[in-house]
Amino acid sequence: MHYMGLFSRAGNIFRQPRALQASNAMLQGNLSLTPSKIFVGGLSPSTDVELLKEAFGSFGKIVDAVVVLDRESGLSRGFGFVTYDSIEVANNAMQAMQNKELDGRIIGVHPADSGGGGGGGGFARRGGYGGGRGGYARGGFGRGGFGGGGYGFVR
């Protein structure tokens, strides 16, 4: 029995670094997942994906564009994302479009992976309505609140 406790403690010692390594790898993966993806906030309720592509398409090739919709009402949540084929193009678009008018509204443009404040319940509490919901009006987009919250996408 004495040896069981020893092996148990030894097992915990060996498990800890692996857990830390996995955590670090996951963090690194999140931070570099899509560096050419930008967050566009302050969108008008009438702004759709086509208008978003039209406004941001002049900077370079758009790989993907999304306007996030409320799951229940189907209305725009006032933000979206544009993904370019390169980081340089994304940076140029962010600089050029920051605080510009689009569809009657002044928009804010930031790197999507910056974690710029706002909601998110983290890994344990995904889903928008229970925890902080994030969103542009609250200072940014929270990854956790977006992940499993069931918000619709328009592509």
From Swiss-Prot:
Keyword set, alphabetical order: Mitochondrion, Ribonucleoprotein, Ribosomal protein, RNA-binding, Transit peptide
The keyword Mitochondrion appears for this protein: yes
Cellular component annotations (GO), alphabetically ordered: endosome; Golgi apparatus; mitochondrion; nucleus; ribonucleoprotein complex; ribosome; trans-Golgi network
Organelle transit peptide: 1-27
Up-regulation conditions: Down-regulated by salt stress.
InterPro entries: Nucleotide-bd_a/b_plait_sf, RBD_domain_sf, RRM_dom, SLIRP/GR-RBP-like
One GO term (biological process): response to salt stress
Major localisation: mitochondrion
Location(s), subcellular: Mitochondrion
Domain RRM as annotated: residue spans: 36-114
Similarity comment: family membership: Belongs to the GR-RBP family.
Quaternary structure (record): Component of the mitochondrial ribosome small subunit.
Protein name according to UniProt: Small ribosomal subunit protein mS86
Lineage, opening ranks: Eukaryota, Viridiplantae, Streptophyta, Embryophyta, Tracheophyta
Gene behind this protein: RBG6
